[in-house]
Amino acid sequence: MPTPTLLDLYQSASKHSQYQVLPASLEKLLPGDQITVKSRHETARLAYIASKVSVCGLRVADVGGNTGFFSFELLDRGATRVDYYEGNKPHHDFVRAAAHQLGLNDRLHTFNRYVTFTHDELAGVDCTLLLNVLHHLGDDFGDAQLNKDAAKQNILACLAALSRQTGTLVFQLGFNWKGDRHQPLFTHGTKAELIDFVTQGTAADWTIESIGVAEKSGDAITFHELNRINLERSDALGEFLNRPLFIMHSKHV
């Protein structure tokens, strides 16, 4: 059987779930006319993250890294090493092959598994990206027997465990447990409820430095600092863009 090309691997990954835009470093390796990208506004989120966190010289973990947009972009921004974790094998295999073709094997370490958030699993990591992962607890990973209330407590337990392992956390959480709109994590589905949940539930372990909120101007999406206006839920933006983006610093590391 012939070895699959990078394009083959990308197209295989695309069949399994929503995926990301290509990082700049990969655009020259994959022909733009042969791929279809379903963006999750990665560029807008990256711009906000980069405005708040300098990763130059840092070891970074990208948990639930999908097709690697943030991993490759943070390497381009000077991260010394990125540990990429992804339980989805097609996604992982694509990122591993792309890292090889770019000569980044020594800086981009790939792990085809889900993070369990146990003690010292991410020890030595300076900054962790945990973007839109934990609302899948009890589904893609974790105890499948959990009910929703127990899952919410486990989400906070995961964040508490991370505070002992990584200095900076970039965090997003979805509004619906397991991605199911019939199982909302919060009664009214508002940003205020989600922010209160994270703020109050992590107060012993994390300092929240900033919260970015998506705003739309024309066709452009940008993340701005939380204020009383953008705190309001915007149904026109859809559920994904209502998710706040937290920049957090550990009280223990």
Model-assigned labels for residue ranges:
Residues 37-56:
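Conserved alpha-helix/loop element of class I SAM-dependent methyltransferases that forms part
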Residues 57-66:
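Conserved class I S-adenosyl-L-methionine
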Residues 68-72:
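Glycine-rich SAM-binding Motif I of class I
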Residues 81-86:
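Conserved SAM-binding motif I beta-strand of class I
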Residues 96-122:
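S-adenosyl-L-methionine
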Residues 126-149:
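A short SAM/SAH-binding and catalytic strip from SAM-dependent methyltransferases
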Residues 154-156, 162-175:
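Conserved beta-strand signature within the Rossmann-like core of class I S-adenosyl-L-methionine
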Residues 179-253:
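Rossmann-like AdoMet/SAM-dependent catalytic core
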